[in-house]
């Protein structure tokens, strides 16, 4: 359950984690945001702190529905980063990620990575990020045994109530369709 996240992070010796990708069709991101039409986002959770959702400006309303603290990517001048990176998209993205992590107080320690993005993109960005922040250790986990999966296996009362509400809604829709 979400209330166990910090305990699970401590048990895995993770100081923070990052989730990349869509708000939907991305179980780790969906778990924290509740879904929504967010096509490109980054969620950063530092142990002991609430998660923060970084998003595109056009997705601010959908991001706000998550109830998380939201910061638009536009806070970081991507065009300037792109130029500074020699027009290397992967490096510019890693530079922005470095700024986001530093803003949240993450510049050293073990950082888990989750989410669904193109493998080539992910590898490139994370390789650059490791060079930009040499005091962090980027940690990957097997999908079926990850921190996020372990958290999703148990539910607190808020999560159970949400499941019940969705079950009720689904039953009503099926009944209306049948009739």
Could you describe each region identified by the protein language model?
Residues 1-99, 155, 164, 168:
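N-terminal accessory/capping or targeting/presequence segment of soluble
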């Amino acid at each position: 359950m979400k209330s166990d996240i910090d305990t699970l992070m401590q048990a895995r010796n993770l100081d923070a984690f990052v989730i990349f990708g869509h708000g939907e069709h991305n179980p780790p991101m969906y778990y924290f945001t509740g879904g929504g039409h967010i096509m490109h986002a980054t969620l950063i959770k530092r142990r002991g702190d609430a998660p923060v959702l970084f998003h595109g400006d056009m997705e601010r309303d959908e991001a706000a529905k998550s109830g998380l603290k939201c910061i638009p990517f536009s806070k970081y001048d991507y065009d300037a980063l792109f130029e500074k990176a020699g027009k290397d998209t992967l490096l510019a993205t890693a530079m922005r990620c470095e700024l986001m992590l530093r803003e949240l107080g993450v510049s050293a320690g073990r950082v888990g990575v989750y989410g669904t993005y193109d493998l080539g993109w992910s590898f490139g960005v994370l390789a650059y990020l490791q060079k930009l922040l040499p005091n962090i250790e980027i940690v990957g986990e097997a999908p079926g045994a990850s921190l996020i999966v372990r958290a999703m296996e148990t539910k607190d009362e808020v999560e159970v109530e949400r499941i019940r509400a969705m079950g009720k809604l689904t039953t009503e829709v099926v009944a209306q369709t049948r009739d």
